Amino acid sequence: MTQQTQQYGVVPAEQIKGMDIMNPEGEDLGKIDEFFIDLEYGRLSYAAVSLGGGFPGMKGKLHAVPWQAFSWTPQGKRLVLNVDKQALKDSPGFDKDDYPDLGDRRWLGSVFNYFRQTPYWGIGEEGSEDAARL
């Protein structure tokens, strides 16, 4: 990676898949298995996370995490998620072979709410608080 990549956090998509995730305490939480782009809004919507070791019975299950819930550590080339292992295990998930309806805003809204993130859709649309500031 170049110095600019480290400074600005711009990486090829192929480097995101498989990237390690830890919490601020340094506990291994898992890896990015897949990520989903919202073509309507032009946003990286959420990542599907496979859990790290220590979670019996979780093989084949993925957990949806809003992309904006992650921070990036260029030194360690890892993503940081401010949750503990149990909270991630209890988060909205789905089977690796049975994805949810990817366009279901109600389901995705529950994912964003679980991680205390504001859903990006609707931001800046007519009548919204953000639209008035533009």
Feature annotation, model-predicted:
Residues 1-134:
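Peripheral interaction segments used for macromolecular assembly
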